[in-house]
Amino acid sequence: MIKEKGILFILSGPSGVGKGTVRKKLFEEETDLQYSISMTTRDRRPGEVDGVDYFYKTKEEFEQLIKDGQLLEYAQYVNNYYGTPRNYVEETLENGQDVFLEIEVQGALQVKENFPEGVFIFLFPPSLDELKNRIVSRGTESQELVLNRLKEARNEIEMMDAYDYVVVNDKVQHAVDKVKTIIKSEHLKRERIAKQYKKILEDGLS
């Protein structure tokens, strides 16, 4: 039995497009996927477990990891760092498990630069009007912030060319089914398994 290396899948798209909803539904149906655990410098909250909820680091440790190139992406939010640790992802992939990362567009572009062999999926809204409705329905943003998010979304949509696949999130189940198809298709790509099968042939002829 050939043991395939896992694949890193990155789901990204503008704020309000439904990344979290699609990811949660996907994980209900695809139990073999490993969700990427983020690293942070924020304080651990009651009940949180290191290596389960986050990997917790001091600011000094985190900044050293940045210098050492040990983060696939990182950002600073409310005076704390958040990022995706390279070692965790690479070790999980080597064990044959797929890793799934749900992230904002800017973070995805950082991952693309640091880990170009990942599979990048852009979650696209059915329309900008629908995206606006989804953001407004949260009830957490002012009108000014909604307009800023829509402006940012337009800019992010223009970055779609950096992705391998585009999935329109018109209905959650439709989007999930398309992502599942992408995962299956990627595992059947010739370049991913050719070396392994060629070795079997060579061993059989030797």
From Swiss-Prot:
ATP binds at G13, P14, S15, G16, V17, G18, K19, G20. Its EC number is 2.7.4.8. Essential for recycling GMP and indirectly, cGMP. This is Guanylate kinase. One of its GO terms (cellular component) is cytosol. Keywords: ATP-binding, Cytoplasm, Kinase, Nucleotide-binding, Transferase. It comes from Oceanobacillus iheyensis (strain DSM 14371 / CIP 107618 / JCM 11309 / KCTC 3954 / HTE831). It comes from the Bacteria. It catalyses: GMP + ATP = GDP + ADP. GO terms for molecular function: ATP binding; guanylate kinase activity. It is found in: Cytoplasm. Its main location: cytoplasm. Residues 6-184 form the Guanylate kinase-like domain.
